[in-house]
C-alpha cells in the first residue's frame, strides 16, 4: 500500500498582534473571492482602502487579549491537534498543516508532502459545516498549489463532518464537563455567520422559516441547514428541551444581510427575557480562536451582563481533546 498524506487546512491568523501583521492577514483573508464575492476592481478598494484600515487597529487589540505564549490560539491548537493526530495515525498518514492566509502555508505543506513521497493526499478543510467561503475556498487553494508544484499525487477531499459522531460526541462531553453542577437556563449555539446571498445560491434556501429542517437534497447541502443539524444533534444528546436551546450567527461583516438571528442580538434578548444563566457553544469552529475567545468569550459576556444576565459559560471548542483526536483519526481512515 502506498504512502498517504493528510493536509489539515484552517484559515490561520496574523503572525503577531501588531497592527501591520493584522493588516496583512485581514487583506489576504478578505481579498479571497469566495469570502467577499465582488469583482476584483470593487473588492480591492473596499478591502484595502476601507475595511482593513478601519478594522486592523481594533482587531489587533482583540488578538492581544487572547494571544497565547506559543502564538495565536487557532495556530497553537491546530499544531497540537496535528501532532497528536500524527501519533494516532502512526505511519498510515503523513500529517501536515496548511493555513490559508498565514504560515505554514498550504503550498509549503504540499511541498512537504511531495518531498515525503506520498501517493495520494486527503485534503481536510477543518470546518465542520460546508460553505464555499471556507471548505470550498480551501480546497480550491490546495488544487491551485498542487498544480503550481506539479504534484502527481491526486487530491481527495474530506467531506463536511457536521454530523460526525465523534465531533458531536466530543462537543457533548465538553458541554457536560464545563457545566458540571452548574445551573443553566438556556444553551445558545453560536455559528459563524455568512451573507444570505451565499446561502441563497442553494435552490430553496431561506424560502421558508423551516426550510433548513426539511429532508431534501437542498437542505443537505446548505450551510445553515448543517448548522441546525449540528446543534440539534448536540442538544438531543444532552436531552435538552427545544425551548432550552437556540441557534444564532456571529461575526457579521459589512452592510449586507447576514444569516439571522445575530448572536449579539440573541444574547441581549435572552438577558432581557429573564435568562440569567446561559451557556454558549461554538460548533462551527474546531479550534478556539479570536471569534470564540474574544468575540463570544469576552464581548458576548459583556453584552449579556449589560442587559441583565448573570452567569455566562463559554464551552471550549474540541481543540486537541483526546476524544476528538481519536475520532478524527477514525474518520480519516474510513475515507
From Swiss-Prot:
Catalytic activity: heme b + 2 H(+) = protoporphyrin IX + Fe(2+)
One biological process term in Gene Ontology: heme biosynthetic process
Pathway as given in its UniProt record: Porphyrin-containing compound metabolism; protoheme biosynthesis; protoheme from protoporphyrin-IX: step 1/1
Highest rank taxon of the organism: Bacteria
Pfam families per UniProt: Ferrochelatase
Location of the protein in the cell: Cytoplasm
Signal peptide, first to last residue: none
EC code: 4.98.1.1
GO CC annotations on file: cytoplasm
Classification via SUPFAM superfamilies: Chelatase (SSF53800)
InterPro entries: Ferrochelatase, Ferrochelatase_C, Ferrochelatase_N
Record's keyword annotation contains Iron: yes
Catalytic EC class: lyase
Positions that bind Fe cation: 192, 291
GO terms of molecular function: ferrochelatase activity; metal ion binding
Keywords in alphabetical order: Cytoplasm, Heme biosynthesis, Iron, Lyase, Metal-binding, Porphyrin biosynthesis
Known role: Catalyzes the ferrous insertion into protoporphyrin IX.
Family in the record: Belongs to the ferrochelatase family.
Name of the protein described by the UniProt record: Ferrochelatase
Source organism per UniProt: Bdellovibrio bacteriovorus (strain ATCC 15356 / DSM 50701 / NCIMB 9529 / HD100)
Amino acid at each position: 500500500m502506498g504512502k498517504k498524506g493528510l493536509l489539515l487546512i484552517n484559515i490561520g491568523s496574523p503572525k503577531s498582534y501588531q497592527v501591520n501583521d493584522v493588516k496583512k492577514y485581514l487583506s489576504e483573508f478578505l481579498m479571497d473571492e469566495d469570502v467577499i464575492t465582488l469583482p476584483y476592481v470593487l473588492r480591492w478598494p473596499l478591502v484595502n482602502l476601507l475595511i482593513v484600515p478601519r478594522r486592523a487597529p481594533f482587531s489587533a487589540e482583540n488578538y492581544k487579549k487572547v494571544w497565547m505564549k506559543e502564538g495565536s490560539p487557532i495556530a497553537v491548537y491546530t499544531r497540537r491537534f496535528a501532532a497528536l493526530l500524527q501519533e494516532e495515525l502512526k505511519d498510515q498518514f503523513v500529517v501536515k498543516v496548511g493555513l490559508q492566509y498565514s504560515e505554514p502555508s498550504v503550498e509549503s505543506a504540499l511541498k512537504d508532502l511531495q518531498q515525503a513521497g506520498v501517493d495520494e493526499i486527503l485534503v481536510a478543510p477543518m470546518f465542520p459545516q460546508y460553505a464555499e467561503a471556507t471548505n470550498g475556498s480551501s480546497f480550491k487553494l490546495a488544487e491551485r498549489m498542487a498544480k503550481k508544484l506539479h504534484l502527481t499525487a491526486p487530491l481527495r477531499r474530506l467531506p463536511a463532518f457536521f454530523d460526525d459522531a465523534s465531533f458531536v460526541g466530543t462537543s457533548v462531553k465538553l458541554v457536560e464537563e464545563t457545566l458540571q453542577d452548574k445551573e443553566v437556563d438556556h444553551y445558545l449555539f453560536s455559528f459563524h455567520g455568512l451573507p444570505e446571498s451565499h446561502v441563497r445560491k442553494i435552490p430553496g434556501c431561506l424560502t421558508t422559516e423551516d426550510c433548513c429542517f426539511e429532508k431534501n437534497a437542498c437542505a443537505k447541502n446548505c450551510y445553515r441547514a448543517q448548522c441546525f443539524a449540528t446543534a440539534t444533534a448536540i442538544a438531543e444528546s444532552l436531552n435538552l428541551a427545544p425551548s432550552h436551546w437556540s441557534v444564532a450567527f456571529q461575526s457579521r461583516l459589512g452592510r449586507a444581510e447576514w444569516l439571522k438571528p445575530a448572536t449579539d442580538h440573541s444574547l441581549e434578548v435572552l438577558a432581557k427575557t429573564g435568562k440569567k444563566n446561559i451557556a454558549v457553544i461554538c460548533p462551527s469552529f474546531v479550534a478556539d480562536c479570536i471569534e470564540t475567545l474574544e468575540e463570544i468569550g469576552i464581548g458576548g459576556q459583556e453584552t449579556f451582563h449589560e442587559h441583565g444576565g448573570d452567569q455566562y459559560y463559554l464551552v471550549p471548542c474540541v481543540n486537541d481533546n483526546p476524544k476528538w483526536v481519536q475520532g478524527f483519526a477514525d474518520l480519516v481512515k474510513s475515507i
